[in-house]
Curated annotation (Swiss-Prot):
Disulfide bonds: none annotated. The gene is murC. This is UDP-N-acetylmuramate--L-alanine ligase. Keywords: ATP-binding, Cell cycle, Cell division, Cell shape, Cell wall biogenesis/degradation, Cytoplasm, Ligase, Nucleotide-binding, Peptidoglycan synthesis. ATP binds at residues 112-118. GO terms for cellular component: cytoplasm. GO terms for molecular function: ATP binding; UDP-N-acetylmuramate-L-alanine ligase activity. It comes from Trichlorobacter lovleyi (strain ATCC BAA-1151 / DSM 17278 / SZ). Transmembrane segments: none annotated.
Amino acid sequence: MYGNIEKIHFVGIGGIGMSGIAEVLLNLGYQVSGSDLRESDTTERLRSLGGEICIGHAAENLTNVDVVVTSTAVQSDNPEVIEAKHRMVPVIPRAEMLAELMRMKYGIAIAGTHGKTTTTSMVATVLTHAGIDPTIVIGGKLNTLGSNAKLGQGKFLVAEADESDGSFLTLSPTIAVVTNIDADHLDYYTGGLEQIKDTFVSFINKVPFYGLAVLCQEDRNINEIIPRIKKRFMTYGLSSQADLRATHVKLDGFQTTFTAHYKGYRLGEISFNMPGAHNVLNALACTAVALELDVPFDKIQEGFAQFGGVGRRFTVKGEKNGIMVVDDYGHHPAEIRATLGAARNGWPERRLVVAFQPHRYSRTKELFNEFVTCFYDADVLVLTDIYAASEQPIPGVSAERLAEETRRHGQRDVTYIADRNDLPDYLAGIVKEGDIVITLGAGNIWQAGEALVKRL
């Protein structure tokens, strides 16, 4: 970065999006400090890398800092934000700092309402295996890396582009991937789905004339915006109309296999260890990026064979007494359908016991009708109270009402357990040999899964 920027402070440094950028900056030699509300594996890792980490937000945490970085979860009344403005220290959003990192490299930005983290992780794995050695910033922990970030020596930076507040428009990627477009974050996108589509068009058209947009042809909303795309693009999907196509899809437990074809030519078979038809599309997006960078197909195949998954994406927490406990980040109705569909297709004979923690009052309200019909692949459904994520309750919006409505819409076995801490004992009392238990949600529901494993 130009000038005398030496020390960078992150408010909410323990967040998955913030910590990755902080780690890359530490590895680049910058002084990094930050604060978070609680200790975690992430804060411990950053501290071990040389970061100055404070627990709790306070004005005195800002010691000789040159810039303050905030996430979307940080409010304007945060004491560190107030102090920074008082000292006339620049306060910038996380995406602006990511854009600065991307400016130093050729950026590969993976965007979309769903599938960003998995696709970014696949791209990072395949390109690393191919010797491209990209810098990596992911919204989840890549299992083979043990982290969500890495400073590479190559020319490319692979990053997840978060559309939740429109700030991904600060990025200027050379390659832009859009996995899908769906209604979400409607507290920000008050214009609804049409505003979301407009924003994605703007994002895609930021690609330079020599770059590429990689677009999923299976997504109706992407198909609707294709006539507005002004840059070179490649489509992928299951249709014969897609530039990059998958056929002969096989889903067997955790193993997913398909045959890839590019513009009518058979490339060969790709196989990886992550279940679900939706991950075939994520793998195609990754393959498209690799082909654009002239990675030989055999290297692409080898990279997928090494893919070890990503944290909180159909992650097995343990298996005891014939009961498998899985955790997944899915918190949008489309993601829930995809995850439960993956479990149903991969293990068709096993009973699925699903514990779901809704994430945010605003999302639960805006997508309520979709939520009540997205759990049909679950044999047993348990709902617990909404994870607020700093939001205030909305009258009439509750997990208890969601449980009532899912039951009214045909879900046969639905139970509401108000306190998440009561879930492990409840689940331990109802599960039996052969069950698959899936904890779902973007909050702290994963803790219930870990506690359940200890009780089995």
